[in-house]
């Protein structure tokens, strides 16, 4: 099996397991409905899994959410160890994913410049319907 393919499959499976574990986590401060693990990146030796978290909320809420998840990383690692056949379960490290925030800023800048990709797409679709 291609090592890159195996790594991608493991990352995907770990991401699914983390979402399951999140639903079982009992922390009243955590708003589970708004937390998404956008991607998982395994190190080459598969001992570390960097998990990028996207969360709708204020910057303070996002920072607090990442801190809560990092405090519970033992729970997540145990859950992965029980549900995934690996020699060693990877150590989990949570980071805030700033990709969504950056894409919103880019969209706002485009709108300020007079170009709105969403409206242009709608116009093109309407023109196709008229033809």
From Swiss-Prot:
Coarse class of the protein's main subcellular location: cytoplasm
Compartmental location: Cytoplasm
Quaternary structure and partners: Monomer. Binds 30S ribosomal subunits, but not 50S ribosomal subunits or 70S ribosomes.
Gene Ontology annotations of biological process type: maturation of SSU-rRNA
Protein's name in the database: Ribosome-binding factor A
Source domain of life: Bacteria
Family: Belongs to the RbfA family.
Membrane-crossing residue ranges in chain numbering: none
Matching PANTHER family: RIBOSOME-BINDING FACTOR A, CHLOROPLASTIC-RELATED
GO-annotated molecular function: ribosomal small subunit binding
Keywords from the UniProt entry: Cytoplasm, Ribosome biogenesis
Native species: Thermotoga sp. (strain RQ2)
Matching Gene3D superfamilies: 3.30.300.20
Gene Ontology cellular component terms for the protein in this record: cytosol
